[in-house]
A protein has these predicted regions:
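Short, electropositive alpha-helical surface patch
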Residues: 21, 26, 34-49, 76-80, ...
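A conserved acidic, glycine/proline-rich C-terminal tail/linker
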Residues: 379-399
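Generic C-terminus detector
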Residues: 393-417
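Divalent metal-coordination and catalytic microenvironments
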Residues: 57, 102, 131, 177, ...
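Histidine/acidic residue-rich metal-binding segments in metalloenzymes
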Residues: 72-251, 331, 353
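His/Asp/Glu-enriched, well-ordered alpha-helical/loop segment
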Residues: 148-176, 223, 244, 250, ...
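Active-site gating loops and adjacent loop-to-helix segments of metal-dependent hydrolytic enzymes
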Residues: 1-3, 11-34, 43-56, 125, ...
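Divalent-metal coordination cores built from histidine and acidic residues
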Residues: 1-135
């Protein structure tokens, strides 16, 4: 390969339901996507801790009971799962799958419980992951496309209102607020100003917001329906600008599997969301790196290092595991230089050859890596996904960059090598 990269692997947001068994489909698609650590939004903590999967996962506690928005969840019900609280009494599973955040993802925290939720965040030393949008009507972005489709629109200020409200809450309380799947230029500008002020604000966006505008609805139909909705082309460009200037701290998939039957119900009835795990790196690399907006290294920071640090994990230090490696000179066993000739005929990587040596780390159980071929061109084929879902607008896309292998705890868990 002309450009093989090694990165520590993690992902901050995998929305899902309870799964079980080491061969669970969800586990396969996580590994295929080049990720090993995810946040899953589940309320059944005891059940979740018993699930055995070949991936690492953290838990996110619901901000409200039953995620209904009427009453804040009770700290007494879940504090024992938070790192730093009653650690001596924790089971190994509880230590392995900690609660690292609070969220009502899918909905913004409602005004009537916001203050109590912020108190819970402070009491547990966690952070608030906020779905920064609130609206009661509408199905797609409000604008020319919604009018052409004859579908009720969602104004862009539905996102800004929650962003502005929660920035003020962070200013008032000192609570760390992390905004999910930000999609509008006006929200990015508000976040940019808040960060310049030194407030504890971070944010993410998703591959579809940097790759698609609401015009994709005309081509892909409900496969491009999501929440927040795809916005205007100007907002898409503003999303890329926010990634390039560092306003965006990380990229997440906002992975939301649905059946094609559900997606065929039409714009008003079809569920929001697309699957994103298995083509996330390729789509982001194609748009951001091939487009000249960021480097390969920065994309790794956005998809790996940043998410790990947000969740309170220390990413594997790849630099500590590599050493310069010199090709051996031809020996008497190759008097005609045949081996050397074959070697010289192979594509040569730029820069210094390096050897990855997992024996150089004392705690091999915590070595989590992904091998990436950043130069591989491939076509997204949903029929080849490990996921049972096929709801993606990226089918048929030509992208570059693909995970070749996923290593968890120094063990090869998935490989295309």
């Amino acid at each position: 390969y002309t450009n093989v990269l090694i990165m520590p692997n993690t992902l901050p947001a995998l929305d899902g339901q309870t799964v079980s068994g080491p061969e669970a489909t969800g586990a396969k698609e996580v590994l295929d996507a080049g990720f090993d650590n995810v946040i899953d939004f589940l309320q059944q903590y005891d059940t979740a801790h018993d699930v055995q999967l070949p991936v690492r996962y953290d838990l996110c506690v619901c901000a409200s009971k039953d995620r209904a928005g009427h009453e804040a969840s009770d700290v007494a019900d879940w504090l024992k799962y938070v790192p730093g609280f009653e650690d001596d009494a924790k089971t190994p599973a509880m230590l392995t799958h900690p609660i690292t955040a609070i969220s009502d993802d899918g909905s913004a925290v409602t005004p009537e419980i916001l203050d109590q939720v912020l108190e819970n965040v402070k009491a547990s030393d966690l952070y608030l992951i906020e779905h920064c949008e609130h609206h009661d009507t509408g199905a797609v972005n409000e604008g020319p496309v919604s009018r052409e489709l004859g579908v009720p629109g969602i104004p862009e200020d539905t996102e800004l209102k929650i962003v502005a409200r929660d920035i003020e809450a962070a200013r008032r309380t000192g609570v760390h607020v992390h905004f999910q799947h930000v999609s509008t230029a006006i929200s990015f500008e508000a976040i940019r100003r808040a960060k310049a002020e030194g407030l504890p604000i971070t944010c993410e966006t998703a591959p579809h917001y940097l790759a698609l505008s609401d015009e994709a609805l005309l081509k892909y139909g409900t496969l491009a329906k999501m929440n927040p909705p795809l916005r205007s082309e100007a907002d898409r460009k503003a999303t890329i600008a926010a990634i390039a200037d560092g306003t965006v701290d990380l990229l997440a998939t906002d992975h939301a599997p649905h059946t094609l039957a559900e997606k065929e119900l039409g714009f008003l009835e079809a569920p929001n969301g697309i699957i994103g795990l298995e083509c996330a790196y390729g789509v982001c690399h194609k748009v951001l790196v091939d487009g000249g907006f960021i480097s390969d290294e920065r994309l790794i920071e956005l998809m790996s290092v940043g998410p790990a640090e947000l969740m309170g994990h220390v990413p594997t230090d790849v630099a500590a595991l590599v050493e310069d490696y010199a090709e051996p000179a031809p020996t008497g066993d190759d008097p005609d230089g045949v081996i050397a000739g074959e070697r010289d005929a192979q594509p040569q990587r730029e820069g210094v050859n390096r050897l990855l040596d997992l024996s150089r780390v004392d705690d091999a159980d915590n070595v989590d890596l992904v091998v990436l071929n950043a130069a591989e061109e491939w076509t997204v084929d949903p029929e080849q996904f490990h996921s049972k879902a096929r709801n993606t607008p990226f089918g048929g896309w030509q992208v570059t960059g693909r995970p070749l292998a996923t290593i968890i705890g120094s063990q090869l868990m998935f490989s295309r090598l």
